[in-house]
């Protein structure tokens, strides 16, 4: 595994993980735009991630797609690749790479907390771990999502005549906020900006 120009790259089989520029073969961990780009010859990813890419970039955003189920092994020469749930967003995956009895895991973006909008994180045994660390510092302590949603609902009840605007990424967090509201029996109408609405009303499956 090489790290060239801020990209993970397996040189002897010309395979990139989440490359930012068009490549011959790209394994995509999830559908967020900083990981999933258009223009690759061959994209390997979960079916949900491929669907998201097609919604965002069009059906011809790659020349070839290989959808993999979680736990399904895919081989390129003497390398074996298996995707496992990352718990980040719908279709997100960790990548297990096996060669000569060595197991390397690339996490991609991941979340270990429970989230009903995607398959939850699965711990994968490995010899080498390459991890995303967006919130890796100890100063990042995320509160319980249900407590935060309860704060929002209380505020709505207290301030009935005021509009409440919740900022969230269109893909992933917006769906999670809506799901958490419904879990807490908040059944009032929710208005969304165009981006989450376009994703929700598309052919994209609602669960992983």
Language-model features, listed with the residues they occupy:
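His/Asp/Glu-rich metal-coordinating catalytic cores
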Residues: 2-10, 16-21, 25, 31-163, ...
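Beta-strand->loop->alpha-helix junctions that form or flank phosphate-binding loops
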Residues: 66-69, 189-193
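Short, catalytically relevant binding-site loops at active-site mouths
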Residues: 172-173, 197
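A short acidic (Asp/Glu
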Residues: 175-180
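Structural alpha-beta junctions
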Residues: 183-189
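Single conserved hydrophobic/aromatic residue that forms the stacking wall/gate
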Residues: 191-208
